[in-house]
Curated annotation (Swiss-Prot):
It is found in: Cell membrane. This is Manganese transport system membrane protein MntC. Disulfide bonds: none annotated. Pfam families: ABC-3. The gene is mntC. It comes from the Bacteria. The keyword Cytoplasm does not apply.
Length: 280
């Protein structure tokens, strides 16, 4: 009741709710492809690699979206370059590049005069989101979802069978980097909601939950987006009522939903699989 009254009275809470739900939905969409491609570590890498861009934008007085997106794309390209031009495997290249970017970000933060805004970027503070940031998040979400819908068949084929995708004449490498671009945009849009540290959880956890419940990609995307939005709403509620960190609250809610599915999913749930074993 107190939360609903706050929504009626305070514009900052309205903006926080809209932004959180938007991030939850778009994270579920892009996270579904990340899960299917086994690229969870890449999501973590890009979320950390944007830190120097955020720090530079802050020190130069620019919108952090610009710096974060630039460094996120640079990290994705750097990982691909190291992987392709050396014997280094993909997971090793990811570890090297994202660690270097994150370390650079920490050094740049030490030169900043104030760490307050940067702290919010690290850990999220959606209750302080500005109207411009809210609209930027909405625009990014619309662009990402529209592009996913436009290239849905290409992403579908290349995610399940890259070899067959190449046989059909699809540019698998282009689709990979294109997906990395979309992942970077989603990561940047989620910074103020859950922060750099926790953004990978919102990308992965709702999608992983949906993965336990269905074998169909289109249904998985819808479920992941729904779980992301629900996690955002419930997490924001607890954040507002109990004065908790908004990003952490959302991630914990998403994790609880995951474990419910992990236990009770009709086909993949732990309890149901144990029950089938007993019957057999």
């Amino acid at each position: 009741m107190l939360f609903l009254e706050g929504l009626m009275q305070y514009s900052f809470l309205q903006k926080a709710l809209i932004t959180s739900v938007t991030v939850g939905i778009v994270s579920g969409v892009i996270g579904s492809f990340i899960i299917l491609r086994g690229m969870s570590l890449m999501g973590d890498a890009i979320s950390h690699a944007v830190l120097p861009g955020v720090a530079i934008s802050y020190m130069m007085g620019m919108n952090f979206f610009i710096g974060a997106a630039t460094f996120g794309i640079a990290a994705a390209l750097g990982i691909g370059f190291v992987n392709q031009k050396s014997r280094i495997k993909n997971d090793t290249a990811i570890g090297i590049v994202f660690s270097a970017f994150f370390a650079l970000g920490i050094i740049l933060i030490s030169f900043a005069k104030s760490s307050t805004d940067l702290y919010h970027i690290l850990f999220g503070n959606v209750l302080a989101v500005r109207s411009s940031d809210m609209w930027m998040t909405i625009i990014i979400a619309i662009i990402v979802i529209s592009l996913v819908a436009l290239f849905y068949k290409e992403f579908l084929v290349s995610s399940f069978d890259p070899v067959m995708a190449e046989a059909y004449g699809l540019n698998v490498k282009f689709l990979h980097y294109f997906l990395m671009l979309l992942l970077t945009l989603v990561t940047v849009s989620a910074l103020q909601t859950v922060g750099i540290i926790l953004v990978v959880a919102m990308l992965i956890t709702p999608a992983a939950t949906a993965y336990l419940l269905t074998n169909k990609l289109s249904k998985m995307i819808v479920l992941a987006s729904t779980f992301g939005a629900v996690s955002a709403i419930i997490g924001l509620y607890f954040s507002y009522i109990f004065n908790l960190a908004s990003g952490a609250a959302m991630v914990l809610v998403a994790t609880i939903i995951f474990f419910i599915a992990f236990l009770f999913a009709p086909k993949q749930g732990l309890l149901f699989s144990k029950k089938r074993e007993v019957i057999e």
